[in-house]
């Protein structure tokens, strides 16, 4: 009880000396159990293979290159590897997961399945995909890719229907129409299998619009049926538009099992790759660094849309990306954000990372870790410390209860002692 005024006094003295402990705009970790997924801006192998070895190409401090805690690939992203033939097997595990990738699939690439398609739909797909990845990596330690085997009993093969520039979609796969079918009004099925992981992220996609082929319009219809549990997942085309639509994808989180892919109209699609989620962990928010181009190229904000508290903290620079190696590699602002990976930090919040766990002038929003006591520390001529009143109220209640108990005990013993003297 007598220590409280001293604590407040010491805190005020600290405040008068300028101690503030604000949240910092970095990504960091509580301890050594962390992992980063990235692209060329954190791809140490890419830099090693350039001549000369110019580490200004990266936003990552080269001291982390031998940490064994980075899975990055120049020119790629997790979304790009998930859907397209341009594939890198991102693999990593940690309690605290950080993502700094996504820029290698943006409006700059202008991808769309057909000439009359829509890149806006693919940006929507990107946002939905990363939402599932971020949410699930807050509760899983391990991420990697796995192939999804499937069995189709017809003679038709998969076809590269959806492609643009150098990007060719191969997940999900399109099964071409059988030669004996005169149109796309038919039902067809394929078996596929998920095994070896705790859960999987798989795509379920349709053309949401009137798909034209040989003067006929078709409504896409795709389903996945879990033959072990009887659960069915499905999408049907609901739009009446004939141009400006594209491949709308939902990203399902499925358990291991035997599945049936079913198409009631148009082409059958079946997943060929999945994100493999393994090793459940205590809830730990992921951290995402904005992945964007210099303003000379068009970027998107889909990773920011996907990264929402409480499962995700988003970090961004307030200025244009201007690299020192070239305009898209080696930006000082993003290098500063990644510098937090060089040290441990006790507390994470929506506003940033706190370097100390004692007091702060900022109340941590969606805090995780050992976070500072809320305090508003000011520095006028006479320092004033205004602390969060809740702990003081609770302390007062506890002290009041303790006083009542002591008084009751004293009265009890006094009455009991008086009774004994009277009896004597």
UniProtKB/Swiss-Prot annotation:
The gene is HE. GO terms for cellular component: host cell plasma membrane; membrane; viral envelope; virion membrane. It is a single-pass type I membrane protein. The keyword Membrane applies. Residues 1-16 form the signal peptide. This is Hemagglutinin-esterase. The keyword Hydrolase applies. Structural protein that makes short spikes at the surface of the virus. Contains receptor binding and receptor-destroying activities. Mediates de-O-acetylation of N-acetyl-4-O-acetylneuraminic acid, which is probably the receptor determinant recognized by the virus on the surface of erythrocytes and susceptible cells. This receptor-destroying activity is important for virus release as it probably helps preventing self-aggregation and ensures the efficient spread of the progeny virus from cell to cell.
